[in-house]
């Protein structure tokens, strides 16, 4: 299966255009493997699998970790991407976005 990697494909776009890009990527993913690095929830909600990459420093050494998220953790992450992981309105919006996303 051909693989496409898009690193920060959301650079310079937002909202509605991000949703259109997310749909286009979902369409490509029906026949190809697609890996997307994004900061836009409009793109992230289209993913079949959602991974969160976290960076930090431990003992003076830069570290990275990758975690697959599902269910409520995914709602929380989309709400975080919307700007308010603990806010009820952002969580409702995240749930709506995930519910509307077509995979």
Task: State each model region's role.
Residues 1-4, 28:
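GG-anchored amphipathic helix commonly corresponding to the ABC/SMC/Rad50 NBD signature/C-loop
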Residues 7-8:
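Walker B catalytic acidic pair
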Residues 16-103:
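C-terminal lobe/lid and adjacent interdomain/linker elements of RecA-like ASCE P-loop ATPase modules
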């Amino acid at each position: 299966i051909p693989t496409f990697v898009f690193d920060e494909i959301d650079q310079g776009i937002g909202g509605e255009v991000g949703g259109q890009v997310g749909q286009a990527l979902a369409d490509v993913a029906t026949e190809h493997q697609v890996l997307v690095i994004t900061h836009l929830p409009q793109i992230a909600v289209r993913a079949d699998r959602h991974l969160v990459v976290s960076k930090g420093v431990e003992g003076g050494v830069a570290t990275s970790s990758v975690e697959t998220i599902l269910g409520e953790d995914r709602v929380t992450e989309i709400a975080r991407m919307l700007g308010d992981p603990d806010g009820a309105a952002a969580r409702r919006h995240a749930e709506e976005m995930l519910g509307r996303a077509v995979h």
